[in-house]
């Protein structure tokens, strides 16, 4: 708690300001982390959970690596299926969702953090990371990625001008993932990652969702609803880059599927969501609360405190920078 961590990774690059692995009930809070070669905070596996990541301010990460962000998590427990996760996707599927809790016993809570970046993802739940509750986070310049995993509940977060749109990547059927009451604002002018080492979705600029290698037939998430999204494209677009197909392992040249909001709703998603300006109070001064007349409030979004991130007043003033 209350640590200033910066300019790490002089020799090793696969490091983090805070790294948690094979541990239980660890709290990382009120830290200011920046100038990292890779993630600011990383949870290295799904054993045994119960961690709390809160009130951290993290920025300037992934300066020497890619496909990451301020917060990264890997599952990689004994029920994570490498063959399903990495190409080709469908030789065999991962184990049923319920088994992940044998290792990921307690939910990991990620809340009330401020992540700002110019590339990658703010919250990257990768390689089977399971049993997470993520809420009240502000991500500017980045959003989130859910790779294969289960029992992730993501709600009441704000993603603004992400280098990549919220991404659901290599989903499993019946994963029990839920995504609701979030605000997404995508602006094409800001969706140009400056770090070429990191991953951007190319032509997805301005889209609300990007999905990659989703199940061929089954549901992609258990719930996606009651979200407020806005883009200067002027309309809602979700894109599925390709679906998993049991009889075809070659993904090259597959035609992407694009969905309007009406088409998206026919799939069972975002039936109560709205495409509208969320009406932030003062975004230029990092106040991303929404005004009383915001359509997001009518959907169930709740304002959360702004500015209470990073170092506390107890941190020695001469050491601040």
PLM-predicted stretches and their roles:
Residues 1-321:
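Extracellular parallel beta-helix/beta-solenoid repeat domains
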């Amino acid at each position: 708690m209350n640590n200033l961590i910066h300019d790490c990774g002089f020799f090793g690059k696969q490091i983090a300001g805070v790294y948690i692995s094979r541990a239980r009930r660890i709290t990382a809070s009120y830290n200011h982390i920046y100038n990292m070669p890779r993630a600011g905070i990383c949870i290295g596996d799904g054993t045994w959970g119960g961690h709390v990541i809160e009130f951290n301010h993290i920025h300037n990460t992934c300066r020497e690596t890619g496909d990451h962000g301020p917060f990264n998590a890997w599952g990689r427990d004994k029920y994570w299926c490498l063959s399903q996760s990495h190409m080709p996707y469908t030789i065999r599927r991962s184990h049923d969702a319920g088994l992940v809790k044998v290792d990921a016993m307690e939910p990991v809570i990620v809340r009330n953090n401020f992540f700002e970046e110019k590339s990658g993802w703010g919250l990257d739940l990768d390689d089977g990371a399971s049993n997470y509750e993520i809420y009240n986070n502000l991500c500017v310049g980045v959003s989130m990625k859910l790779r294969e995993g289960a029992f992730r509940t993501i709600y009441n977060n704000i993603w603004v001008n992400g280098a990549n749109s919220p991404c659901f990547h290599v989903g499993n059927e019946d994963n029990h993932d839920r995504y609701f009451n979030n605000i997404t604002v995508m602006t094409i002018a800001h969706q140009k990652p400056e770090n070429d080492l990191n991953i951007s979705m190319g032509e997805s600029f301005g889209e609300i969702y990007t999905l990659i290698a989703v199940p061929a037939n089954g549901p992609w998430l258990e719930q996606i609803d009651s979200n407020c999204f806005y883009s200067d494209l002027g309309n809602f677009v979700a894109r599925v880059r390709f679906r998993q197909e049991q009889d075809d392992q070659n993904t090259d040249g597959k035609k992407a599927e694009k969905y309007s909001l009406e088409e998206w709703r026919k799939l069972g998603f975002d039936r109560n969501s709205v495409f509208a300006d969320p009406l932030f109070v003062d975004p230029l001064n990092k106040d991303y609360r929404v005004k009383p007349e915001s359509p997001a409030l009518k959907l169930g979004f709740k304002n959360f405190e702004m500015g209470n991130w990073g170092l506390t007043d107890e941190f020695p003033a001469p050491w601040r920078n």
